[in-house]
Amino acid sequence: MGSANAAALAKPEGQAPAALAAIVASVVRENPSIAAAEARLKAAEARAVGAGLWRNNPEIEYDSETAEVRTETVGVSQTVEWFSKPAARGRAADSRTESLARELVNVRQRVITGVLSGFVLVDQGRAKVELASDRTQSMSRFADLSERLFREGDISPSAAQAARVAATQAVMREQVAQIDLSNAEQELAQLTGVAPIAWPSFDTSLPEPLNIDDVDVEQLPSVLAARFRREAADRDIKVAQWDRVPDPSVGVRYGDEGNSDLFGISISIPIPVLNSGRSEVAAARADAVSAAVDLQAAQRSASIFLRETARRYEALRSSQVLWLKSGENAVTQQADVLQRRLDGGDIGVVEYLVQLQQLYDAQESSIELQGQAWVAWFQLLQAAGVVEEWIGVER
């Protein structure tokens, strides 16, 4: 990525812990998508070396003829490219190599963001399973209590039935939470290539938002990759134009015919009649127009992605701060008040169940809010092109 972004945002607040960086670095080393991108880059580098060379090698020819006089000749011929041709091909290949180098950075950042987001979803899933288990136990205990109170005639049949339904719903929600966790662990295992382990957890301390005004969108890897693709397409026009110029073939031969020495020089030049190369030039120009449009799309997409992820993270972080400031304590206090009101007979069984469900729903929403905020943070780092700097993974 560009040095401007690295200089401005290389150390955003909330630097990743070393343990998390070590896990991600291990995943990156073994990731097949990154390995494939690295292989494509190596292939492009090799092609760039070959693109600057002449396409044709010298040819050696031996001719022998026996008639009244024996004739033998040895010759060497070479198709000579105009010197601008290899240079034009080399420049176009260099641009494609630069594009793939930026695409490799882009792939790495996408993989790292996906891995970090996967960690968050697994951590969130485990927290939701723990909460669902607590809900199941609470509802089960209350259903047992309601059944006893019903037998003693203290509550109505409908109230006891409501408690049993709530307990059943809690069991179902716990099963759903277990399934969601299993799916999250499966997706993460597919991404990391290892079976579920003690993945890292994420606390409620969210980093401060990035100042996206410091981000130079033109230096983001996705934009740079598109820019070099356009540059390569522009240079391919020159390649196609030079390919229209015929390459002469020059040859020399030496031999003998009977007792006489033979020496000859030959020069041949193709006549571009059947294929003038105009269609290749037209195609190259069309490809250049397409690459220019792709660059504009990449610029627009990167700018929108950066702006919207920043807005989304700021909104989620503000909600998280508000929850920690007032909502979390309010839920704990309300749970105690609710239990005292039930014990004192101030509320009935059904009202107690409704309010208790609301408290559990609020806690579940807070878990989801925290997970969404962390995912948005990692997406913001990716959008700003600094997720590798934040996590501390070396390229």
Show the residue positions of the predicted features:
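Amphipathic alpha-helical coiled-coil segments and their boundaries
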Residues: 23, 30, 37, 79, ...
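Short segments within alpha-helical structural elements
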Residues: 107-109, 169-194, 330-386
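Bacterial Sec-pathway N-terminal export signals of envelope proteins
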Residues: 1-59, 63, 79-80, 87-88, ...
